From Swiss-Prot:
GO terms for biological process: isopentenyl diphosphate biosynthetic process, methylerythritol 4-phosphate pathway involved in terpenoid biosynthetic process. It catalyses: 2-C-methyl-D-erythritol 4-phosphate + NADP(+) = 1-deoxy-D-xylulose 5-phosphate + NADPH + H(+). Belongs to the DXR family. Its cofactor is Mg(2+); Mn(2+). It is an enzyme of class 1 (oxidoreductase). Disulfide bonds: none annotated. It comes from Bradyrhizobium sp. (strain ORS 278). GO terms for molecular function: 1-deoxy-D-xylulose-5-phosphate reductoisomerase activity; manganese ion binding; NADPH binding. This is 1-deoxy-D-xylulose 5-phosphate reductoisomerase. The keyword Transmembrane helix does not apply. The gene is dxr.
Length: 407
């Protein structure tokens, strides 16, 4: 039994739903809080967590009268308590407090803690059978089989919160699994879609951060420029919907209006369209199994005029090929792919490698890990985190060599 409900067969949501937002001060959290702000009569906030933005977290806690608030940095607990003095809001700090927030009795949990740190809190929500809007890539990229099996066993409901997987989630409800031929994830192509490979190699940080359509954080914007993000989304789709790599295609769509498509056996293709606004997929998750009124602009196709599509260029964007390779390799390779990419992006931001070296470092790390013979099935969150740590060490060790070759 899948933890992703591909048919609308769940009871209508309660009049007032209790909500926990893990990662409330990040970009996904900000969009979520904006939606909650628009319907105070419908939602009650149970818990909020943040990384280190005490001022922003405390402001949200006061505004929404949250019952519990946690900050990831244990050293900031005193500041958080001071910021919430006199409110009666319970406070916590550190990993255990973030997990406690996730385990509290909320009907709906937004899992938007970034990085591997988001895995254990998401599992805490899953283990109590919550409805979890999943915006953390690592839960699937690093521990996909294990995470989805655990969700199914606990009776949890996993709702994809990012735009592409939410689009597939909506389109998949038009048919049955045995009728599916393939899913198609769209990609804008990023700022380097038409650049020559040799020019992409030399791209600057400023150029990589100029995404043509989406407003996102620094790391994911760079991932979009390299199309590593699309590779990660291919991996996520495989685990979310139990798809083989051959059942997942990527199509470059510069306008970012069509977010995902599903082809069925009768050759019908069902697509989900919407403006490039993260509040749209989050609103779908927040209202599911109903639909709520969202604040986003309505889609005006006449104004847009033209929608174009093209095949991805694997020479221009080798990261996409590496994602498929790691997915086919299995047994922890996707965890290595993700960890090595994070090390590579940080090195690029820090000025230690060229943009073109990001994919080379990821490939070198995957090859080094494969030669080590450490491949083993994942059976726990600790297994996934151990592989993640090992891959980061390998990538860091290979970094000087990759940087020297590019200089």
């Amino acid at each position: 039994m899948s933890a992703v409900p591909l048919r609308n067969n769940k009871a209508i949501a309660a009049d007032v739903r209790s909500i926990t937002v893990l990662g409330a001060t990040g970009s996904i959290g900000d969009s979520t809080m904006d939606l909650l702000r628009g319907a105070p009569e419908r939602y009650r906030v149970e818990a909020l967590t943040g990384n280190s933005n005490i001022e922003g977290l405390a402001k949200l806690a006061r505004e929404f009268n949250s019952r519990f608030v946690a900050v990831a940095d244990p050293a900031r607990l005193g500041e958080l308590r001071e910021a919430l003095a006199g409110t009666g809001i319970a406070c916590g700090a550190g990993e255990s407090a973030i997990i406690e927030a996730a385990a509290r009795p909320a009907d709906w949990v937004m899992a938007a803690v970034s990085g591997a740190a988001g895995l254990k809190p998401a599992l805490a929500a899953v283990d109590r059978g919550a409805t979890v809007a999943l915006a953390n890539k690592e839960c699937l990229v690093c521990a996909g089989d294990f995470f989805m099996q655990r969700a199914a066993q606990a009776g949890a409901c996993i709702l994809p919160a990012d735009s592409e997987h939410n689009a597939l989630f909506q389109a998949l409800s038009s048919g049955n699994r045995e009728e599916l031929v393939r899913v198609i994830i769209t990609a804008s192509g990023g700022p380097f879609r038409t650049w020559a490979p040799q020019d992409i190699e030399q791209a600057t940080l400023e150029q990589a951060l100029k995404h043509p359509n989406w407003s996102m954080g620094q790391k994911i914007t760079i991932d979009s420029a390299s199309m590593m993000n699309k590779g990660l989304e291919v991996i996520e789709a495989s685990y979310l919907f139990a798809l083989s790599p051959d059942e997942i295609d990527v199509l470059v769509h510069p306008q970012s209006i069509v977010h995902g498509m599903v082809e069925f056996s009768d050759r019908s293709v069902v697509a989900q369209l919407g403006a490039p606004d993260m509040r749209i997929p989050i609103a779908h998750c927040l209202g599911w199994p109903e639909r709520i009124k969202g604040p986003s602009a309505r889609l005006d196709l006449a104004k847009i005029g033209t929608l174009t599509f093209e095949a991805p260029d694997f020479e221009r964007f080798p990261g996409l090929r590496l994602a498929y390779d790691s997915l086919r390799a299995g047994r922890g390779a996707t965890t290595v792919f993700n960890a090595a990419n994070e090390v590579a992006v940080a090195a690029f931001i820090g000025g230690h490698i060229r943009f073109g070296a990001i994919a080379r470092l990821v490939e070198a790390t995957l090859n080094d890990w494969t030669r080590s013979g450490n491949q083993a099935p994942l059976s726990s969150a600790d297994d996934a985190i151990a592989i993640d740590h090992d891959a980061r060490k390998r990538a860091a060790g290979l970094l000087p060599q990759i940087a020297a070759k590019a200089s």
